[in-house]
Amino acid sequence: MAYAYTFGGLKMADKTNANIGFEKQLWDAACVLWGHIPAAEYRKVIIGLIFLRYISAAFEKRYNELVADGDGFEDDMDAYTMENVFFVPEEARWSTIASAAHTPEIGTVIDNAMRAIEADNKVLKNVLPKNYASPDLDKRVLGEVVDIFTNNIDMSDTEASEDLLGRTYEY
């Protein structure tokens, strides 16, 4: 599938097929945001959501490994950090965010998720965006972007997904 549109200085048609799937999802998210917020703000919205989606997937993978081990360490933060995985509290997990996608509180849910992650991961203190509850960001539109990242971006292979943040920023 080739697109003639230009986004991020690159023509979608010039991309390899391996990248088009992910970049099409970014394009779809940008199209949803188009007309609702300034184009310069897309990155802030999208990168924060991709970050949440990625760390939640990495956490879930590690959580399942710890449960399978059966030693009861699935709630021990050190069991995650020793594997270079951020601890993600319940209120910040993607499943919580996705379940709130079609509520008027979605922006607050995402901002609270960012705060919770910062509280449990001091290295991220004051780093994550917390602008999703802004009255300038239409919550219906934000919910649509969350849906795109829930339904169309596969994070099951977190090692392969590590590059998504860099690719998102470059795109």
Which residues are covered by each model-predicted region?
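Non-catalytic, mostly N-terminal accessory regions of nucleic-acid modification and defense proteins
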Residues: 2-171
